Design a protein with these regions (language model features):
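Acidic/polar, glycine-enriched structural segments that form the non-catalytic walls/loops
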Residues: 1-82, 171-172, 498, 505-508
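Aromatic-rich carbohydrate-recognition surfaces in CAZymes
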Residues: 6, 10-16, 81-196, 222-230, ...
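Well-ordered alpha-helical scaffold segments within catalytic/enzyme domains
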Residues: 27-35, 48-53, 92-106, 155-173, ...
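Active-site acid/base region of carbohydrate-active enzymes
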Residues: 30-63, 112-134, 155-224, 247, ...
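Extended ligand-binding clefts on enzyme/binding-domain cores
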Residues: 34-42, 123-151, 222-226, 242, ...
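Alpha-helical positions within canonical tetratricopeptide repeat
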Residues: 105-106, 181, 247-251, 255, ...
Length: 508
């Protein structure tokens, strides 16, 4: 029948080019399947999901999700972008995952696309210092959100560096892209500048302080943002040397060293509010509004959460310092923060870690929320979806994100290796914890959601089971990307995202 023929062509039967052909073009699939605990089912689905995020008109335009989060409560009277847009941060995760699969074509096209979302004198409505990458855009480059997130300016540099090191970009191509895209980005990360667009009226940016961190909500000094900035600048220095721009190469390294030297001073509290055992008051903050992590300053209002003290909010962003090679997994401050992030005795409002029971498995599997006092999710009084009443609920609650199980799985790989204990038995334990958990969080259609239910508060609206995906963005490309990269890291026995030049400079 006609339907069967269309399906056959879609899959790639005979001479038709289809999805089976794309899977066949990925040389790493078979090896990575062996790192899974579901015989590769979620991996193959993830490969398809990630490639499907690429726009079909604007080649290389990788979006965050083909969904509107909590779409059941979103009005259909007018079009809403939702997550069907380009964020350079999500873009980086997806592109690095595709490279991990062995796709050398899509990542190159995607990297070249990024020029469309970088600020310049051609950006409509913009005046100020060029070089930073826009927060959120449509695939055609039209601006939607304009918050300056410095990790999103670092990640295109990190991506370009990696493509060059993997041989996807030649020396000549890398030099060309340095001159027209990466040098302005690195200059912005080094010098900052003045920004004037939409609600940002002549705002001065002074790195590493960022207008918004990776959750797009708070201004200040962020461990995850700063780790990307440092790795991006070290990568930029390598590329500048290739381009025979030695003066800039030295400037970028000097800035990276300066930011690195301020990490603990600006971001690590020694008198935190989370100080009852196993917590001890010594930990990396999610974000510090200024350079004093001990002043217990208030964070900005976000998702209905008001009067939040920075000292009581932790997240896993500090693990990015290890992921990108800025700090050793055995670093004292890194290890001192683990008890807080793992403290299941904390009140639910500030607690981050939750564990999930799985049929037939004695051990519970771990998951983490974005951060304490996260309001981006169902309310606790009735279990209604985010913004269901048309405004932020004061009892809204962000749930567990599968991404962070992958991030922790990467950290534990790095820590086990640094301790000299990475053998087949230990790797199997890691795999059966972190890989299995991410597979369990996927739904029956093999889609990994943004968030899964943590069993806190009322469940009367949706009657979710613990660990089941909520009505948050599904599939979330970043979730699938994190899963793919975790498999690649376990196959390689080293963290896929690690920046070798950064690690060589800062990890002693």
């Amino acid at each position: 029948t006609g339907t069967q023929k269309v399906l056959a062509n879609f899959n790639g039967a005979g001479d038709a080019i289809g999805w089976e052909d794309y899977l066949a073009s990925l040389p790493a699939l078979e090896a990575l399947s062996k790192e899974s605990t579901d015989s590769g089912k979620l991996l193959y689905a993830s490969a398809l999901v990630l490639k499907a995020q690429e726009d079909k008109t604007y080649a290389g335009g990788m979006i965050a999700s083909l969904s509107n989060p909590w779409g059941d409560t979103a009005s259909a009277d007018k079009a809403q972008t939702g997550y069907k847009a380009v964020w350079p941060r999500d873009f980086y995760q997806v592109t690095m995952a595709m490279l991990a699969l062995g796709d050398r074509v899509t990542p190159k096209v995607a990297f070249e696309y990024l020029e469309n979302v970088q600020t310049s004198d051609k950006t409509p409505g913009y005046s100020g210092t060029p070089g930073w990458f826009l927060q959120k855009t449509h695939v055609d480059g039209k601006v939607e959100w304009v918050g300056v997130q410095l990790d999103q300016t670092a990640m295109p540099i990190m991506l370009g560096w990696r493509l060059w090191k993997e041989g996807v970009l030649t020396d000549a191509e890398m030099t060309t892209w340095y001159d027209k895209m990466l040098k302005p980005a690195a200059n912005f990360l080094t010098d900052g500048g003045t920004v004037n667009i939409d609600w940002l009226k002549n705002v001065t940016i002074t790195p590493p302080k960022t207008i918004q961190e990776r959750w797009e909500e708070q201004t200040g000094y962020s461990p995850s943002t700063t780790s990307a900035i440092i790795a991006g600048l070290v990568a930029a220095s390598d590329i500048a040397k290739l381009a025979k721009d030695d003066e800039s190469a030295a400037r970028y390294l000097a800035a990276a060293d300066k930011y690195s030297s301020g990490l603990e001073k600006n971001l690590y509290t020694t008198s935190g509010m989370l100080n009852k055992a196993p917590s001890d008051g010594n930990y990396y903050l999610r974000i510090s509004a200024n350079e004093d992590p001990n002043d217990r300053g208030l964070l900005g209002v976000s998702n209905g959460q008001e009067n939040v003290n920075e000292s009581e909010v932790i997240d896993g962003g500090f693990l990015e310092l290890v992921r990108y090679g800025v700090r050793s997994p055995l670093n004292k401050e890194i290890q001192n923060t683990l008890p807080e992030i793992d403290d299941t005795s904390l009140p639910d409002i500030v607690r981050v870690k939750y564990e999930f029971s799985v049929a037939g498995k004695a051990e519970k599997l771990p998951g983490w929320r974005r951060y304490g006092k996260d309001g981006y999710g169902e309310d606790t009084s009735a279990g209604r979806g985010y913004n269901a009443t048309g405004k932020n609920a004061p009892d809204g609650r962000g749930r567990v994100w599968p991404i962070f199980t992958g991030e922790r799985g990467h950290y534990e790989l790095a820590r086990t290796a640094a301790n000299g204990k990475l053998n087949d038995e230990e790797l199997s334990k890691l795999r059966n914890t972190y890989v299995t958990a991410m597979e369990i969080f996927a739904n029956e259609g093999l889609m990994i959601p943004e968030q899964v239910w943590d069993n806190v508060g009322s469940n009367q609206t949706y009657n979710f089971t613990a660990g089941e995906g909520t009505n948050s963005a599904t599939p979330l490309a970043w979730s699938h990307a994190e899963y793919v990269k975790l498999l690649r890291s376990y196959a390689d026995k080293k963290v896929w995202d690690l920046n070798a030049s950064t690690s060589a400079r800062y990890v002693k």
